């Protein structure tokens, strides 16, 4: 008799659990359908706004080209000044449109991420208790760590005069400032050469043999890229690129700071004279 009562209790408990899971499943499906149905409309609205901004941006670029062509052909100084101001306003407008496009794309990305996160939270209701507990612990650990922002930073607005010089590239008032493209290329080269020098200037990372010969002005072992002095009697012979301020091997002859004359392509006269005397003997 007792066994039958226990079985009935188990059956009723199982029925309650099944009913609860069915209710949760029904809620999940309903939320999922609402999310899936509304997401395309929200994305389409953002895409439409993005397309409108892009059309305005293309029109502004065309306006910039037209005004710049007129500026190059204009001889009157007053008219050139008016065209320059017109060009300046168009450049500012183009940058603002670009910033708005970036903001719309960021909103679209956040919209998709929020919907995915919402569905993931709902799906945890159907996991086993042990799995649900592990997922909860994992989410707590993730929340305790510094959160990485997925938001793309807005581009900083530069000054109007720098924007103008960046696009016109030949206007009288901005001739002393190099074009942005050239500045960016120069900055990239400097960054690459600096990183390369930092890598070459750190021989500590290598396992150094105490009996290994040393070179260069720094009296360190051979590592990284090195260049040889063209003076046959040079006491040091080899030099690290970073120690002699080189980023690439120069063409022709090269002399180290101890052996060079007026420049790195010529040898010191006193050193050359001593060399000739030795040959005469």
Swiss-Prot record:
GO terms under biological process: flagellated sperm motility; male germ-line stem cell asymmetric division; male meiosis I; negative regulation of apoptotic signaling pathway; negative regulation of cell migration; negative regulation of gene expression, epigenetic; negative regulation of stem cell population maintenance; negative regulation of transcription by RNA polymerase II
Molecular function terms from GO: DNA binding; histone deacetylase regulator activity; histone H3K4me3 reader activity; histone reader activity; phosphatidylinositol binding; protein-containing complex binding; zinc ion binding
UniProtKB keywords: Chromatin regulator, Coiled coil, Growth regulation, Isopeptide bond, Metal-binding, Nucleus, Transcription, Transcription regulation, Ubl conjugation, Zinc, Zinc-finger
Location, primary (coarse class): nucleus
Entry GO terms, CC: CCAAT-binding factor complex; nucleus; plasma membrane; Sin3-type complex
Region ranges (PBR): 265-281
Coiled coil regions, renumbered to chain: 49-101
Compartments (UniProt record): Nucleus
Domain notes: The PHD-type zinc finger mediates the binding to H3K4me3.
Modifications made to the protein after synthesis: Sumoylation enhances its association with SIN3A and is required for binding to some target gene promoters, this is the case for TMEM71.
Region (Disordered): 123-204, 261-281
Superkingdom of origin organism: Eukaryota
Residue ranges, compositional bias (Basic and acidic residues): 131-141, 261-275
Family (UniProt): Belongs to the ING family.
PANTHER family given in the database record: INHIBITOR OF GROWTH PROTEIN, INHIBITOR OF GROWTH PROTEIN 2
Chain's role: Seems to be involved in p53/TP53 activation and p53/TP53-dependent apoptotic pathways, probably by enhancing acetylation of p53/TP53. Component of a mSin3A-like corepressor complex, which is probably involved in deacetylation of nucleosomal histones. ING2 activity seems to be modulated by binding to phosphoinositides (PtdInsPs).
Keyword Nucleus: yes
Protein name as it appears in the record: Inhibitor of growth protein 2
Cross-link type Glycyl lysine isopeptide (Lys-Gly) (interchain with G-Cter in SUMO1), residue numbers: 196
Record's compositionally biased regions (Basic residues): 182-194
